[in-house]
Regions:
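Structural preference for solvent-exposed beta-strand-turn elements
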Residues: 1-197
Length: 197
């Protein structure tokens, strides 16, 4: 059974199309107009082994906020759609990823309940090129709200802002991959004592 999600989101500020295949091989084709954000989405697809297509046309003449936010919302909705009924998945996933001096620890529960805990070092550089580093938390908030997952992201240390953000996306990719993969020992079983996720 194919586990593909496709979402189109159009507002007066942006036009977004996202397609994700959870059982892909990491083929990525992304274009948002925000170079560093594209780089992070590439990390998400490649390290999650998700086939990911993202096409966003946003009001970048204002700034990148709407473009990034709406893309993250559409990505979360597409991820939820691709998960389907969640029967037979592992549900939980975690990963710790270093990037030189930075470290990210990510744990996810595909619970159906949106919740984010996010910590990263204080006094980070405010910008990476045209990317506002305060947007990382907002990306995660937007994704979590639409995907309806519980997500804990902790960066206990790091100095380089690029590394701090990138290791979060790499760890998120691996944690989502592990949580969404099918468990061969749980075929046909929903991983919940409630009977619903």
């Amino acid at each position: 059974m194919s586990r593909v999600g496709r979402v189109e989101r159009t507002t007066k500020e942006t036009s977004v199309v996202v397609e994700i295949d959870l059982d892909g091989t990491g083929k990525v084709d992304v274009s948002t107009g925000v170079g560093f954000f594209d780089h992070m989405l590439d990390q998400l697809g490649r390290h999650g082994l998700f086939d990911l297509t993202v096409k966003t046309d946003g009001d970048l003449h204002i700034d990148s906020h709407h473009t990034i936010e709406d893309t993250a919302l559409a990505l979360g909705a597409a991820f939820k759609q691709a998960l389907g009924d969640k029967v037979g998945i592992y549900r939980f996933g975690n990963c710790t990823v270093p990037l030189d001096e930075s470290l990210a620890q990510v744990t996810v529960d595909l619970s159906g309940r949106p919740y984010l805990v996010h910590t990263e070092p204080e006094n980070m550089a405010p910008m990476i090129g045209a990317y506002d580093t305060t947007m990382t938390r907002h990306i995660l908030e937007s994704f979590v709200a639409q995907a309806q997952i519980a997500l804990h992201v902790h960066v206990p240390y790091g100095r380089n802002a690029h590394h701090i953000v990138e290791c979060q996306f790499k760890a998120l990719a691996r944690a989502l991959r592990h949580a969404s993969e099918r468990d061969p020992r749980a075929t046909g079983i929903l991983p919940s004592t409630k009977g619903a996720l």
